[in-house]
Amino acid sequence: MWTKINSERKSSMKRVYDFLKKAETYYLATVEGDQPRVRPFGTINEFEGKLYIQTGKVKPVSYQIAANPKVEICAFCDGEWIRVACELVEDDRVEAKKSMLDAYPNLRGMYDENDDNTQVFYMKNATATISSFTAAPVVIQF
């Protein structure tokens, strides 16, 4: 039973990963006090069975996530859109940062897994909804 549940979870998570990877750009929404903040992101990586995003610790988004780790991601691709509501959990391990930077080598000009700025987060308690104008929404939890 556990193997089946774990396999289904990975398959569902992969669908979210594939959507965000294909879209290339997604929008990450946070909150700063009572003001919503949204900005484009482009990193998505699977590491140790979790979906990760990356930013820099010096950016306002890092402070916003620290104050309130509940975020929402939105992207549009091929006539469908996805919304992912989740909590972001920082993973400060060099291995997690290296995996992200290996997946996005163009970021190595600005980031390094051993610097004090590179920051990666994995998604926890995530609910993704894939919608379109022609089909019923698909809800994915991971």
What positions do the PLM features span?
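N-terminal leader/targeting segments and the immediate start of mature chains
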Residues: M1-T25
